Amino acid sequence: MRSNYLFTSESVSEGHPDKVADQISDAIVDLYLSRDPEARVACETLVTTQRIIIGGEVRSAVPVSEEEIEKTVRETVREIGYEQTGFDWRTAEFANHLHAQSADIAQGVDAGEDKDEGAGDQGIMFGFATDETPDYMPATLYYAHRILERLAEDRHQKKVDFLEPDAKSQVTLVYENGVPVRASALVLSTQHSPALSSKEGQAKLRDYVKSVYEDVLPKGWMPDDKAIFVNPTGLFEIGGPDGDAGLTGRKIIVDTYGGAAPHGGGAFSGKDPTKVDRSAAYVARYLAKNIVAAGLAKKVTIQLSYAIGVSEPLSLYVDTHGTGTVDEAKIEEVLPKLIRLTPKGIRTHLKLNKPIYKPSAAYGHFGRKADGDFFPWEKLDLVDKLKAAFA
């Protein structure tokens, strides 16, 4: 395992077109779950210039009206902050193509008198945790998220008047002996108002971004000025869905571990928690984080796999990357004794049948604060049980 290297992760803001789509899709998931905790939802979203299109499959014991769906979609876009000529929450055309879930899928997934609830699809899902940040996340992604959250905070609180919603960040860190010690390059592109179109305006933006870097990064981590790139292509006035079309599920590395861990390929947003693409990835993160917090490893990757219609996972794999203090096979043996890794077992343990998903659709699904019903997969309530299992 290498100990001295450079590593890079990127993040995108809540106003990035793909994230706009993710937030709309998860707002629809939350809307249905708020009416029926057992609702089935698979909602995809396309956003482009003055158009919002949703489609997919739903099943709910409580009907949700077309008007409620449209109101939820427009409110989501309003909260992000889009009131631009090319994309305005009030006037964008909206089309709803949601329809009933396939009966073929339902018969294989639903629980019956003689069987447990099956997985909603086949697939592989990964969880990861590392001790390099307090949130047990890769430092590169942690800081990439925090930088953009700071920009959004300043924009929403009107601390600055020149930022628009669309932005991207990228952080390259120097690792020495496996520990991040400083940044070697920082990249940020942010949509801005026409007021910054002049050379002086671009200099003002650069100074502002540098001040954010200095506040967010640990002291002494700033790279050379020539390695700080702010809007490197020049002006960025046309952005959001007007500049690029956005689709649900296209930022899966931003959503997870910034490239520091494998990804099974399944996106999260727009899916109710019976879909193991989402719930199994959440429980894999939950297990990985608790393993590291319990001191059983400094870094761990977990893989789960499922077959559609089958409740129990087909495989469970644990890799501590040479940092473990206990045998990996023993961890694999212990984990299913602490939590049932069936779709229903996961949803029950983590209490996932609630309208809690829209906040996860921007700035990462992992490394967030478990707060009330939100982000329950970030809780550390297995630590004592894991320690006891290896005492």
From Swiss-Prot:
One of its GO terms (molecular function) is methionine adenosyltransferase activity. Its main location: cytoplasm. The keyword Magnesium applies. It catalyses: L-methionine + ATP + H2O = S-adenosyl-L-methionine + phosphate + diphosphate. Binds 2 divalent ions per subunit. It holds the Pfam family S-AdoMet_synt_C. K(+) binds at E44. It comes from the Bacteria. One of its GO terms (cellular component) is cytoplasm. Its EC number is 2.5.1.6. Residues 101-111 are annotated as: Flexible loop. Keywords: ATP-binding, Cytoplasm, Magnesium, Metal-binding, Nucleotide-binding, One-carbon metabolism, Potassium, Transferase. The keyword Ubl conjugation does not apply. L-methionine binds at E57, Q101, D244, K275. Mg(2+) binds at D18. GO terms for biological process: one-carbon metabolic process; S-adenosylmethionine biosynthetic process. ATP binds at H16, D166, A167, K168, D244, R250, K251, A267, K271. It is an enzyme of class 2 (transferase). It is found in: Cytoplasm. Pathway: Amino-acid biosynthesis; S-adenosyl-L-methionine biosynthesis; S-adenosyl-L-methionine from L-methionine: step 1/1. CDD domains: S-AdoMet_synt. Homotetramer; dimer of dimers. PANTHER family: S-ADENOSYLMETHIONINE SYNTHETASE (PTHR11964). Belongs to the AdoMet synthase family. Catalyzes the formation of S-adenosylmethionine (AdoMet) from methionine and ATP. The overall synthetic reaction is composed of two sequential steps, AdoMet formation and the subsequent tripolyphosphate hydrolysis which occurs prior to release of AdoMet from the enzyme. This is S-adenosylmethionine synthase. It comes from Zymomonas mobilis subsp. mobilis (strain ATCC 31821 / ZM4 / CP4).
